[in-house]
Each structure stands twice: as C-alpha cells, then as structure tokens.
Swiss-Prot record:
Transmembrane segments: none annotated. InterPro entries: Trp_synth_b_CS, Trp_synth_beta, Trp_synth_beta/beta-like, TrpB-like_PALP, TrpB-like_PALP_sf. PANTHER family: TRYPTOPHAN SYNTHASE, TRYPTOPHAN SYNTHASE-RELATED. It is an enzyme of class 4 (lyase). The gene is trpB. The lineage of its organism: Bacteria, Pseudomonadati, Pseudomonadota, Alphaproteobacteria, Hyphomicrobiales. This is Tryptophan synthase beta chain.
Amino acid sequence: MNQILPNSFRSGPDERGHFGIFGGRFVAETLMPLILELEKAYAEAKDDPAFRTEMDGYLKHYVGRPSPLYFAERLTEHFGGAKIYFKREDLNHTGAHKVNNVLGQIMLARRMGKQRIIAETGAGMHGVATATMCAKFGLQCVVYMGAVDVERQQPNVLRMKALGAEVRPVTSGANTLKDAMNEALRDWVTNVHDTFYCIGTVAGPHPYPMMVRDFQEVIGQEVREQILETEGRLPDSLIACIGGGSNAMGLFHPFLDDAGVVIYGVEAAGHGLSKLHAASIAGGKPGVLHGNRTYLLMDDDGQIQEAHSISAGLDYPGIGPEHAWLHDVGRVNFLSATDAEALDAFKLCCRLEGIIPALEPAHALAKVADLAPILPKDHLMVLNMSGRGDKDLASVAEHLGGKF
C-alpha cells in the first residue's frame, strides 16, 4: 500500500504488458514471434468496427446476451441484510462465462488464418466453450485436461467429445489445471505454424491477460446498465470467485474507477490456509509461471506447490497479474472460502433460489453469507454467478456421502 495510486485503475497494462511489477511476457524464444503476431492482430481487430459488430451479433444471437441480473429474493431474506443480485452467466450458451472470451479469441484466430485451436481446461467449461466455437466455425480442436479433472468432470469431457474435440488427459504433476496449461504451451511451441492457443483466463503472457479481460468486460458493462435501470444507482459492492480470475475481472473492470463500489475477490481456501489450498494472494508470493509474473503458491526454493480446491476451476497455483496488482494497490479486497463453506453455500443456493451453482461461484456465495447479514438492507451487492453446477453434482454427492 506504499505505492503511488494511479489516476485510473483501468489504464493498464503498459506497452510491454505490465501491471506494476506484475504481468509481462516470459516465454521461450520460439514463441516470441507468435506473441508479437497475436498482439498486432488483436490491436488491429480492436480498432476494426466490423470485428466488434460481428462479435456483438454472435454474443446476442448465439451466446444469448445480455445475461439477466437477478434479484435473489429468498437468499436476501435468509441473510437479512444486503440486497443480493446474481449476474446470471450460468444462463449463457455452454453454461458459464467462458464463452464470452472464447468467441473473441476464435474470431481472432480465424482472422489470423489459424486452423487448429488448442486450449487448457480445469472444470471443463473453457474446454466446452472452445469445442463449441470450433464446431461452429469448422476448426480442429484439441483440449488438454488434467487426468484428475477428467475423472471429476466427466459430463464436460463427454460434451467436448460430442462437439468433435480431442480431449488429451495430462498425467504429469498433480494432473490438474497447471499441468494442462504446461502441456498446451508445449504443443504451441511445437506447432507454431498453424495453431492458436486459446487461453481461458486472465493469465499467460501479454497480451492474453488484457485480451481475455477485454472480452469478459461485457459482464460488468451489462451489470452497470442493468443495476442503473433496476435500482437507479450503482451497486455498493461486487463479489466473484477467483482462480485465474477471468469472471471476476469481467465484472470488476468497468467499476474499478468508481470509488464507492467495494470489490471482493474470493479465492479457494481448500482444506484451510494452513493446509492444502489454492489461495495465491493469501498464501503465495510473487514469481513467474506460464509467461507472467504474479502471486504464486511456491516453496522457499521457488518451486510451484500443488494447489487444491474441491472446485476444478479454482485449483490453479497462481492468479491473473492484474488481480495481483489490484491487490497490491488496495483496490480489491481478497477473501477465501474453504471447500466446506462452498458446499454449504451450494446447498443453500439450490434450496432457496432453485439455482444449482457451479462450485466456483459457490465460493463467492460462501463469503456473501458472511458479509450480507452485517450490511444494511439498502446495500446493493452483485455476485457473479459465473457458471451452472450440473458438472459438479457427482462430485458434491460424493463429498456429502450421497446426502444432499
């Protein structure tokens, strides 16, 4: 907090992809020409009104945007404090926020003449979104997925295969998201001529954190319009779960310069912060992974430690570099929720709202359960319901001993 605060929290990154000391592009020499080619192509697409018009058309007619801003009336009554709204990204085509970003990247890949798309996935939602868009546009799709995640996210594995994607289980490391990303990067280095790497979160080398944020920003832009229309003012607080952090960044970014809006990011505390967890801000330190500098779970020798979360989409040992910077300058408050707290919130949402949340946003909902009761009734809180929980039912049932 001894940093000089910027005039705007929305002006980053700089031309080399840095948010303060975070971000950048730490990649193999063979990848640098691709990174620079991607940066140039994205800058050109961003300035092309036809690209934006085409994307907006697909977002409306294919993805189903805008997604609703829903007043969670029974949860609000249950907690007895803040008025709670859900941004219903779970209602998008493919069932999560991931498709917003994938659409943009696949359109960019086509513009660049790439015919083969690779992606990493944890919970499977980014993989499903990538497989979906590749099917729509007739592109080859290969998805890397940790073997552990393949087992606990079988419904999404079947969806990807049904959509024509090749799912490659990864059996190195902890067999989860970090390892899938490692394999995808190896593939990209080997197949630079025809392959586009579609990263699913606001991590990776520049320009990915910026690009994914820009494609996800539609979430917060819609919330801004919807809450002004519904309540006549901006929300008092925003809350979202954070693994890499794309759903959170999509919600947060349009509000970063609104000083009156308090922002909460919720990491996965797993079995507890003194045990196995995936809370990079709470339990990590700055280091370099997957092409960018950010907060990472590392040992004293700088080796990456394995992350754990009941949620396959949150068990990543790092966090997006812009989130790391927003933490350091004090603009976003980072909290964490354990597996047990997320399961309790999952059950509560099912029973009170008739909405089965993904385990990822259930972590954010767990902190709503802590915050909402102590806030006044006129406090407007918006939670990003980033995905639906069909994919998690078998996993939840197993953890609850089959008793919901």
